[in-house]
Amino acid sequence: MAQNAKHRVPFRRRREGKTDFRQRLGLLLSGKPRLVARKSLNNIIAQLMAYDEKGDIVLVSAHSRELVKMGYKGHCGNLPAAYLTGLLLGKKAVEEGLEEAILDKGLHRATKGAAIFAVLKGALDAGMDIPCGEEIIADEERLNGTHIKQYAELLKEDEEAYKKQFSKYLEKGLNPEDLPEHFEELKGKILNL
């Protein structure tokens, strides 16, 4: 008979690739609420979470679909939508008196200019205090959708490709070239809530 175990089975959520427990422990020991930002193909979800023994508690949340209700006509999974979702979350959090947090990026790799850091920048601009390095956040031009505008202008020469690429924008009545102005309009609307 064996005297000791040679193989230790990892926790279920680690096996499923959902949780990095070492990182989670470090975040929980900070004692601050966690800004959890998650991106899917078509949406951005941002939540301010607090630890509880029975399970994490959502203090404040924002979803990119809330932007549509406010009049946003762009795609809900791009960088401008991520920034606006973070701004909306930050505005809600500051109103609730939650001004301090720490970023929980989950299992996402820390890539410069990623949507998760656009959410972080939005929360910072709303007045939250979250430690981060400025070099990881995307340029202002990418956050407001100027890169989408430039691509649309480039693609405009081929009318068929332009209509295929930006069909949803055109369907909603927004020219992709007007995205930065539309972004600024919605940003002002969120800040004046």
UniProtKB/Swiss-Prot annotation:
Part of the 50S ribosomal subunit. Contacts the 5S and 23S rRNAs. InterPro entries: Rbsml_uL18_euk (IPR005485). Keywords: Ribonucleoprotein, Ribosomal protein, RNA-binding, rRNA-binding. It comes from Methanococcus vannielii (strain ATCC 35089 / DSM 1224 / JCM 13029 / OCM 148 / SB). It comes from the Archaea. GO terms for cellular component: cytosolic large ribosomal subunit. It holds the Pfam family Ribosomal_L5e. Belongs to the universal ribosomal protein uL18 family. This is Large ribosomal subunit protein uL18. The keyword Ribosomal protein applies. This is one of the proteins that bind and probably mediate the attachment of the 5S RNA into the large ribosomal subunit, where it forms part of the central protuberance. GO terms for molecular function: 5S rRNA binding; structural constituent of ribosome. GO terms for biological process: ribosomal large subunit assembly; translation.
